């Protein structure tokens, strides 16, 4: 199966909706250039689809050209439950950096946080 295809266990007609609970890893960390930024968010699955390892965090702005843009969830969060999602990537540049993200289901449909699926999600850190 490719990285972004329909998952066989995805309930037909289910709704993707994710609520933000907390930044487990706070923004504003100082990181040396070339080191890895590791960010963890706590989400609540407010939809009817299980959020599985076939979901992704998708970087939509702020990364270097050619950088990895898809990051697997690496966990499953059932509807009505909370769970942590962690991503990691190398940092470049200097000063305050921000990378914006959306979520993506196994079909490749991207969406944001909240009831309207438009809520913003990002990492912000200082490269030294």
Go through each PLM region and give its residues.
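Short beta-strand and strand-turn-strand segments in soluble, beta-rich domains
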Residues: 17-23, 59-73
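Short acidic, flexible loop segments centered on an aromatic residue
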Residues: 44-66, 103-105
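Proline/serine/threonine-rich low-complexity linkers at boundaries of modular beta-sandwich domains
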Residues: 7-21
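Short, solvent-exposed loop/turn segments enriched in Ser/Thr/Gly
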Residues: 34-40, 96-99
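Short beta-strand segments of immunoglobulin-like
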Residues: 25-31, 74
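Terminal connector regions
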Residues: 53-54, 93-128
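Intrinsically disordered, low-complexity Pro/Gly/Ser/Thr-rich segments with frequent PxxP/GP/PP motifs
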Residues: 67-94, 106
């Amino acid at each position: 199966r490719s990285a972004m295809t329909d998952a066989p266990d995805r309930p037909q007609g289910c709704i993707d909706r994710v609520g933000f609970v907390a930044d487990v890893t706070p923004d504003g960390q100082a990181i040396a250039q070339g080191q890895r930024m590791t960010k963890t968010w706590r989400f609540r699955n407010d939809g009817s689809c299980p959020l599985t390892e076939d979901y992704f965090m998708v970087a939509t702005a702020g990364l270097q050209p050619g950088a990895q843009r898809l990051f697997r969830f690496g966990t499953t969060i059932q509807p009505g439950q909370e769970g942590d999602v962690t991503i990691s990537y190398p940092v470049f540049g200097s000063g305050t950096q921000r990378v914006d993200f959306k979520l993506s289901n196994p079909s490749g449909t991207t969406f944001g946080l909240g009831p309207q699926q438009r809520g913003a999600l990002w990492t912000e850190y200082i490269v030294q």
